[in-house]
Each structure stands twice: as structure tokens, then as C-alpha cells.
Amino acid sequence: MSEARPFASQTGKSPSEKKRVTLRDVAEEAGVSLKTASNVINHTGRMTDATREKVQKVVDRLGYRINVSARNLNRGRTGFITLAVPCLTTPYLAGLANRVIDIARIYDYSVYVTTYAEGTSRGAASLLRNFNATVSDGMILSLSEMEDLTPEDLSVDYPLVCVGARFTHYKADHVTPDDVQSARLATEYLLDRGVSRPAVVGSRTDFAQLSTLRDVTEGNAQLRMRGVFEACCDRNIALATELMPNVGHDWSIGSGARNMQRIIDSGVPFDGVIALNDQLAMGALSTLAANGISVPDQVQVIGFDN
């Protein structure tokens, strides 16, 4: 029977003096081949339970730790993916980041999360162009409403998945919710409960452009407005100009509050509010409360998100 050789963890040396235990050390100490030791550590291969248990005891005693960098290099992968979003301040994008991280962990991946300056020279196009495949195996890109990507921007030589209601020119895998149908359902929910004069908080469409919404195929705001418009048209419900102010690209709580006040100040009667995201809905609710308007007794409110 071979005598166990002392390692740094057994000699009382300081951490800086400790010798890193290698897979070869484990194999020699256990009296097995490198392949067998590797199979035990990676939970693969066929061997007797006794052999597997013997090797595992050596692993535990020597304090062997997998060299992740070396393993990933051998496998031709980094073990990381990149998630790129316009910002992390909105609940939707923060929630997206959390879900991506949770799912990646199941597959033994870590996630680099980065933001980009949408609509600038350091926007998504720059990020795609300068992606470093030596530190990340691919990218999940949350598409910006403020930046139009060309086919050339999206023609990359690494795995790319785009998220959001923008056209990707069939150059990348693409995940997006059905904004039109979802907005229709939200609007119909209010109409089914007696709302006949709906207001909309979050529109980026001028009133004169409403008739063109049926042709819209991208953009969260435009697609959601299309769903609202179609649902109202089906019920012969008119949308008043004063009840759907153009908020631009600001879908924050503050914007919801300010634009709800604009609607109230217009003096045009309304009995329902369709907010195109939940932050706008929260802002609208605070303004309604500040004006003494009861929800849902006087005005019913619905938001769009989870």
C-alpha cells in the first residue's frame, strides 16, 4: 500500500506557500489514471463504486478544486455569456437580468451584465462590433427603441439572441412578446368592465397618426398603441386627442404622474386609464390619488408588464 504524500494543506504552510493541487496529484495519490480521476470529478465515465469513492476521498482530503479556466479552454468555451441592456433602472430590464442569471446558473454559466448608451456612438451597434469572444461565449441583446440596427450590425460571428419588439433582418435569433395582442387584451379587460372613455398614458404616437398604426410591425410603444387602437375600433370607442398625450421615450413613474395630470387638466371626461407599462401606471395612480379621484370607483386603471 502506497504511503500518502504530504501536501501544502497538510504541512501548515501559509496560503501563499501552498502548492496548488492538480488533477495529476489526485490521480497519483489515488493510484488511478488521469482519465479516471477526471471522470470522477466531472461525474462521467464508467467505473466501480469503490474506485469512484476512493478517488473522491483523495479529492476531499487534498482539497482539489477544478481549474475552471483550464477546463473551459479545453472545452472551447469561456463559461460566460453577456447580457446587454439599455439600462438597469427599469423593473422590466432588472427582472430580465435576474431571470437570465438564474437560468444560466442551471447550465453552469455565469453572466456578464452590461449597459449601452442607446442612440449614441457607444450604443448597441458599437457593442456588437467590439464584442470579445475570448471572454464570453455569446450575447443576449435587449433591443433599444432609440436605435435602429442594420443587417450589417447584426451579422456577427458569435451566438446572438435579440430580445424586444424590433426588426432584426432575420440575422439573429429573436425573442419578443406579442405586444399587439397583449395590449388588446388589456384594453378589452377595461371595456368589458364598463369603461367607455379610455385615456392612454405612454403613447409615442401623434393623434393624426392613429390610422397608420395598423401597419406598425415594431416598437413596443407603437405595437401596444396598435393593440389599444384595434380594441377600441372593434367596440366603436373613440380615442380623444387630449386623453392620449405623446410622452416621448419617457416611460418612468414621473412621466406617468405628469402625463396623468395633463389628462386631468384637459377637462375631457375619462373613466379608464391604459398605461403602456407598470411604471407609468404607478405614476398615474399617484396623480389620480392626489387629485381625489377614486380607483376603481371613478376611474379604472390597467398597466402593461408582469
Provide a role label for each language-model segment.
Residues 1-77:
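N-terminal helix-turn-helix DNA-binding module of bacterial transcription factors
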Residues 27-32, 38, 51, 70, ...:
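Small-residue (primarily alanine) positions within well-ordered alpha-helices
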Residues 68-69, 123-127, 148-150, 255, ...:
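Short acidic active-site motifs
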Residues 124-180:
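Short beta-strand-centered segments that line the small-molecule binding cleft or hinge
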